[in-house]
């Protein structure tokens, strides 16, 4: 277990919007989350009634009120690399204020809501577990949720998990799986002036490209538990050629398959192996999808509290990790996911208030929390 630094930076949870800005202006690129984890841990240890544990640079805080149900609320502390987009600044568009900067959308808005809720919600109608974890944006082997599950899976026990991914305040059920793989195409080198002496591996990619092109013509939509997912099969990278006057002796194409949760990871892999049976395949990564699970009673009641029509999560998120643990999970948080990872990443400030209000309404504690909407602007 990692210990907090002797003098962690202070995060003031009095005002939601100011807390949000402080979190954003606290750099925490993947594998550099330690100081922010220290600050988050310090906040949580000051809250009466929370049992706090730390594993690496992930922090877990739990209530123990004896409620019959437990809800887990999770958000990752890390961001993708900074590109001259910190410190943050406020930008107004059509009367709406946005905080602009790295991590605003993905996902320090969600982290701010969760940390504010943990600091102010003292008598929820369900026991709560808050998880602030490291390394979501990089390879799965570093993922904080995975490390917690390996070291202390009991900390993740819950009847429902809410992952505070940016969904623009809409509940998004489940997530699609993802498979990345390469196909190798062999050729034979020759001088380009005598090309007939060789075999051009780049040209021999054509059948693969034709399969990909033909695949785009079919309906990519898959209905799962009432939600309409959209699959994708796309070439994403290509490696070929040794010199401008040499016929390419080999080529390697990378393909990404995004598949709906009506199939397992194993079924998705089999489908790709059959589709591209004529070429050697190397699987780079394969992540399972998660079914929506919105028919579960807790999820149904939360969707009702949010009050909007739920949708599917097209990308892969850590709800799949909870699904593998047998825990129903959904995505819900402030921020438009279209802005995630962009250089001008931003989040509408009012979306934090809206997300907080939905959670408070569902947890039946309207009178306990004073929302940050009044005087909450940074």
Question: Language-model segments: what does each one mean?
Answer:
Residues 2-77, 82, 250-256, 271-274, ...:
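N-terminal helical capping/dimerization or prosegment-like subdomains
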Residues 2-4, 11, 166, 173-174, ...:
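Metal-dependent amide/peptide-bond hydrolase catalytic core
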Residues 40, 111-121, 145-148, 205-208, ...:
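Buried hydrophobic packing segments
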Residues 46-54, 90-91, 278-282, 307-311:
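Short secondary-structure junctions
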Residues 59-63, 94-101, 281:
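Generic recognition of long tandem-repeat/solenoid scaffolds
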Residues 70-132, 144:
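Active-site metal-coordination/substrate-binding segment of hydrolases
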Residues 92-97, 117-131, 154-157, 212-222, ...:
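Phosphate-handling active-site elements
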Residues 112-180:
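Acidic/histidine-rich catalytic neighborhood of metal-dependent amide-processing enzymes
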């Amino acid at each position: 277990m990692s210990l907090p630094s002797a003098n962690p930076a202070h995060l003031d949870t009095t005002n939601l919007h100011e807390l949000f800005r402080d979190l954003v202006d606290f750099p925490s690129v993947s594998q550099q989350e330690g100081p922010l984890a220290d600050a988050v841990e310090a906040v949580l240890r000051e809250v009466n009634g929370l049992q706090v544990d730390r594993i690496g640079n992930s922090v877990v805080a739990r209530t123990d009120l004896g409620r019959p149900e437990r809800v887990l609320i999770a958000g990752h502390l890390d961001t993708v690399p900074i590109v001259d987009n910190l410190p943050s600044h406020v930008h107004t568009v059509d009367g709406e204020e946005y905080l602009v900067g790295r991590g605003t959308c993905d996902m320090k808005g969600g982290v701010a809501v969760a940390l504010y809720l943990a600091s102010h919600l003292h008598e929820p109608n369900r026991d709560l577990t808050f998880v602030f974890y490291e390394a979501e944006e990089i390879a799965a082997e570093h993922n904080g949720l995975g490390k917690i599950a390996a070291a202390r899976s009991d900390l993740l026990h819950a009847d429902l998990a809410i992952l505070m991914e940016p969904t623009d305040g809409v509940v998004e059920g489940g997530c699609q799986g993802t498979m990345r793989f390469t196909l190798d195409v062999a050729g034979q080198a020759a001088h380009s002036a005598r090309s007939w002496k060789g075999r051009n591996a780049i040209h021999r990619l054509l059948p693969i490209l034709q399969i990909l092109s033909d695949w785009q013509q079919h309906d990519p939509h898959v209905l799962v538990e009432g939600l309409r997912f959209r699959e994708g099969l796309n070439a994403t990278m290509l490696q070929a050629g040794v010199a401008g006057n040499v016929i390419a002796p080999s080529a390697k194409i990378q393909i990404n398959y995004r598949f709906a949760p009506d199939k397992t990871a194993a079924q998705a892999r089999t489908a790709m192996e059959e589709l591209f049976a004529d070429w050697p395949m190397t699987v780079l990564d394969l992540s399972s999808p998660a079914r929506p699970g919105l028919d579960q009673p807790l999820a149904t009641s939360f969707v009702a509290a949010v009050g909007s029509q739920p949708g599917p999560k097209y990308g892969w998120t850590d709800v799949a990790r909870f699904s593998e643990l047998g825990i129903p999970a959904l995505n819900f948080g402030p921020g438009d996911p279209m802005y995630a990872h962009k250089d001008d990443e931003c989040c509408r400030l009012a979306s934090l208030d809206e997300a907080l209000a939905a959670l408070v309404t569902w947890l039946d504690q309207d009178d306990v929390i004073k929302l940050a909407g009044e005087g909450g602007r940074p």
